[in-house]
A protein has these predicted regions:
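Second-shell loop/turn segments in exported
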Residues: 70-73, 98-104, 178-182, 245-251
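Serine-dependent carboxylesterase/thioesterase catalytic core
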Residues: 68-69, 93-96, 107-201
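Short, well-ordered alpha-helices that flank and scaffold nucleotide-derived cofactor binding pockets
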Residues: 84, 88, 146-147, 263
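Extracellular secreted precursors and ectodomains with disulfide-bonded cysteine-rich loops/domains
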Residues: 53, 177-180, 239, 277
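Secretory targeting and sorting signals
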Residues: 1-35
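Conserved beta-strand scaffold positions in the cores of enzyme catalytic domains, especially
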Residues: 65, 93-95, 157, 207-209, ...
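C-terminal catalytic-base region of ester-bond hydrolases, centering on the histidine
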Residues: 203-280
Length: 280
């Protein structure tokens, strides 16, 4: 019997929801010190097609692809379709778990990303990587690019519903004790103010931001945009497919979002906003 994609999506969503709920229970049941010391386990399983450390790049696909998960996520959840699509297109694909399910300080997570990118480059003998990240995973690499030497090691950064300017949906509870990264992703936070000034798109990296009007986590959804220009393109899925129903959780599995990722990775420069991509 063929697998039911809707069932798979719901199963993954419920798993993530359980993770978030568990974190909230920790906050409500424990002291701030206890919450701050909590560890959120992962299985350490990469998405399908990823982390083949013997993979060799090609002239057609010279840059390894690195997938970066979002807050409360892990390298496996939600990311199989994206990883498989990149692998089938000829990329060497890699992914990592980081930051205690991406709840720790974003600066520390960026340092983990730096070490991982260096490992990927060493294993593949490539000069640069191409990064695609979901939610915080689309924003956090910008800290690596701006402050940790990543500008010379990243060819492309594609953000899928990235939290580039934070979110107004931070909730009424305090998140600093159990999720410093959540507090840092609040709209107007000191972290984001420093990250976005004076230049949102530093270096020679090509930036592509793919967002959905139905994002219920990064709000407003336009918070994911960066300043447009020759090296920066903003894509709203519903502008190309009005009936596209992707939202924050499902966007990394969405076929149109994946198509835009491939569009960006296959060409020099960011994604081509005039590409004839529509409902898939």
């Amino acid at each position: 019997m063929a697998p039911n994609p809707l069932r798979a999506v719901l199963k993954t969503f419920l798993a993530l929801l359980l993770t978030v709920c568990t974190a909230l229970v920790v906050v409500s049941a424990g002291t701030p010190a206890q919450a701050a010391g909590s560890k959120y386990p992962t299985l350490g399983i990469p998405p399908a097609g990823a982390n083949d450390w013997a993979c060799e790049t090609t002239r057609r696909r010279p840059h390894p692809a690195v997938i970066v998960h979002g807050t409360f996520g892990d390298q496996k959840s939600l990311l199989d379709p994206l990883s498989l699509s990149l692998k089938r297109d000829g990329f060497c694909v890699f992914s990592l778990d980081y930051g205690n399910r991406a709840t720790g300080p974003i600066q520390d997570s960026a340092r983990e990303l730096k070490r991982f990118v260096n490992r990927v480059l060493g294993a593949t003998d490539a000069g640069k990587v191409q990064i695609v990240g979901h939610s915080q995973g689309g924003m956090m690499p910008r800290y690596y690019i701006k402050n940790l030497g990543g500008a010379g090691k990243v060819e492309d950064l594609v953000g899928l519903a990235p939290s580039n300017h934070g979110t107004e949906s931070t909730g009424s509870f305090s998140t600093k004790s159990f999720c410093p990264a959540c507090a840092q992703q609040a709209a107007g936070s000191d972290f984001l103010t420093a990250l976005n000034n004076p230049d949102e798109t530093p270096g020679t990296v090509d930036y592509t931001q793919v967002v959905t009007k139905y994002d219920e986590v990064v709000t407003p959804y336009t918070s994911g945009f960066l300043t447009p220009g020759p090296r920066s393109t903003n894509i709203t899925l519903q502008d190309y497919c009005p009936v596209n129903l992707a939202e924050h959780v499902t966007i990394p599995m969405d076929r149109l979002a994946i198509a835009w990722t491939l569009n960006a990775f296959r060409r020099h420069g960011p994604a081509n906003a005039d590409a004839p991509l529509g409902c898939i």
